[in-house]
């Protein structure tokens, strides 16, 4: 927050299996409505709200934004999605790209089963890769950060391509050598990832974006 000069709200949202979909999703929508209504009281501005999420959180804010578009609600200024799950259908072990991590596959599969006990994985609010071009039209600017050694890398880049084809100003960066969750764990690639996020926030504030790490692709 200090480095970006921004006000940060870190949401401790309720999770599955105690609260499966759509509980957390609807909780997020209600929370954002509250923040918009009380932005000045919190020290921010309702006209400059940026949503950021990592992994499941990135999936959540993407689905929320699709809902804003469908309902004609005020859109966030932009999104920052870090290694987002974009396709919850199929077997995780069959996903291409990254390093096959048995432990992550097991944990992710369990998480999906808890979040969606009754199925519905092809719902675009859950698997944004299935959103149509019409559903994506008008999507706000978005930065998608992926990790090279992550089974979610390919689907996130495919979703970025779908956004671009729908006319979205999208920036997609893959951090070489990084694994899923590298930002909070502060493992390889976290400095590059943090620099990209700070640079993108400045872009959303003044329209000037530069890639601080040319080696990142």
Regions found by a protein language model. Give the residues of each.
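Alpha/beta-hydrolase superfamily serine-hydrolase fold, recognizing
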Residues: 1-217
């Amino acid at each position: 927050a200090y480095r970006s000069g921004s006000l940060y709200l870190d949401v401790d949202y309720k999770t599955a299996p105690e609260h499966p979909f759509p509980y957390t999703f609807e909780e997020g929508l209600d929370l954002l409505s509250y923040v918009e209504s009380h932005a000045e009281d919190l020290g921010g501005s309702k006209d400059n709200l940026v949503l950021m999420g990592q992994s499941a959180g990135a999936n959540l804010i993407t689905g929320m934004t699709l809902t804003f578009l469908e309902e004609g609600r005020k859109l966030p200024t932009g999104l920052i999605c870090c290694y987002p799950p974009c396709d919850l259908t199929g077997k995780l072990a069959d996903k291409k790209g990254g390093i096959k991590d048995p432990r992550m596959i097991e944990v992710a599969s369990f998480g999906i089963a808890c979040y969606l006990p009754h199925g519905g994985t092809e719902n675009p609010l859950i698997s944004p890769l299935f959103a149509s071009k019409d559903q994506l039209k008008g999507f706000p600017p978005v930065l998608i950060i992926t990790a090279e050694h992550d089974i979610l890398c390919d689907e996130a880049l495919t979703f970025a391509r779908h956004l671009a084809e729908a006319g979205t100003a999208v920036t997609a960066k893959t951090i070489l050598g990084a694994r899923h969750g590298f930002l909070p764990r502060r493992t390889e690639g976290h400095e590059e990832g943090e620099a990209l996020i700070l640079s993108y926030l400045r872009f959303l504030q003044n329209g000037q974006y530069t890639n601080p790490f040319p080696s990142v692709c």
